[in-house]
Regions:
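Rossmann-like S-adenosyl-L-methionine
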Residues: 163-325
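Class I Rossmann-like S-adenosyl-L-methionine
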Residues: 1-195, 245, 295
Length: 325
């Protein structure tokens, strides 16, 4: 936590305070905060995000062990108990006005933690996982959800190659490795201010989890084919398919949400793909779909669901969702 400072810590507390209201997605709150606080540098923003998201991942564990639900105490607790900073070290990283609060972290907290508190899961979600996977399997899964999700990129083969991108990142001192399963993926050690980087702005790379890249690979879309991506959303897998097709053929990106398709537009422009055709549909019975009957070579359907599969990347969802959702 070299970039942690009183300024960065106070920013983390401010962001965490807003996220803990659970009125909006955490990533939206974080993005809006950074837009309003442009004095935070490129090395400071990732630290703010890491602290805030660590609190959300470990929320009930931190509440029980710190004896507080206050954002300030939870940020101090996550730095001590999750990131491993000693109480003495913490005092050098935060403003003097918080030193008394740091001392409170040293107080012993009586009582055993329940298994759902230990893994910071709502009781209903732990019970669901336990029933489906058994205690050992559920514990293993719950433990993995406490770890920060990897930061993966997909290389746009229409613009570049994985080797070229890796070489350029290495030349800039950015630590990156090829993904193990996706032939087009790159895993970063740290976020490096991606959205302002030339490779991103010119469409050479896109942020995409390796799992999503593999799903696109399984479609096996080929040059010159006609392909449909139902539930295309913001188009992550659509763009991967378009590149796999070597910017040839015809790729329809269908969705019932105009808002989601709107988010595809800037990504599509950066990608340089001309074979992608976003189309808003009313339902699965839309006439535009029926006109394609018998003409399509490949279909991808990644339908929206509860979203619980994204908990590692969106840990606030476990607190914003209810069992009935």
């Amino acid at each position: 936590m070299e970039s942690l400072s009183p300024k960065v810590f106070d920013a983390a507390v401010a962001v965490t305070t807003e996220i803990l209201k659970f009125t909006s997605p955490a990533d939206v709150i974080l993005s809006n905060y950074f837009k309003s606080n442009r004095d935070l540098g490129s090395h400071e923003r990732p630290v703010v995000a890491d602290v805030a998201f660590s609190v959300i991942r470990n929320k009930t564990y931190l509440e029980k062990t710190s004896g507080s639900e206050d954002a300030l105490m939870l940020c101090l607790a996550t730095l001590n108990k999750v990131f491993g900073l000693s109480l003495k070290s913490l005092k050098t990283k935060v403003a003097a006005r918080w030193h008394k609060d740091i001392q409170r972290l040293g107080d012993e907290r009586a009582g055993e933690l329940s298994i759902s508190d230990r893994y910071s899961l709502p009781d209903w979600l732990w019970q669901k996982l336990d029933k489906q996977y058994g205690t050992d399997g559920a514990s293993s899964l719950a433990q993995s959800l406490l770890r920060k999700a990897p930061f993966d990129l997909r290389v746009n083969l229409v613009r570049s190659s994985r080797d070229k991108v890796l070489a350029e990142l290495a030349a800039e001192g950015i630590e990156a490795t090829p993904t193990l399963l996706s032939p087009h993926g790159i895993r970063l050690k740290n976020n490096f201010g991606l959205q302002k980087h030339r490779l991103f702005l010119q469409g050479h790379i896109e942020v995409q989890d390796e799992g999503s890249q593999i799903l696109a690979q399984l479609v096996d879309a080929k040059r010159g084919q006609m392909v449909v991506d139902f539930c295309a959303g913001a188009g992550g897998k659509t763009l991967a398919l378009g590149a796999m097709m070597s910017n040839s053929g015809r790729l329809y990106a269908f969705d019932v949400s105009a808002k989601r398709l709107e988010r595809l537009k800037p990504r599509l422009k950066r990608s340089g793909l001309s074979n992608v055709h976003p189309q808003l549909i009313g339902s699965e019975t839309d006439p535009r779909i029926h006109r394609l009957t018998g003409k399509i070579d490949r279909v991808l359907i990644d339908a929206p669901c509860s979203g619980l599969g994204t908990l590692r990347r969106n840990p606030d969802m476990k607190w914003r969702q209810k069992e009935e959702d």
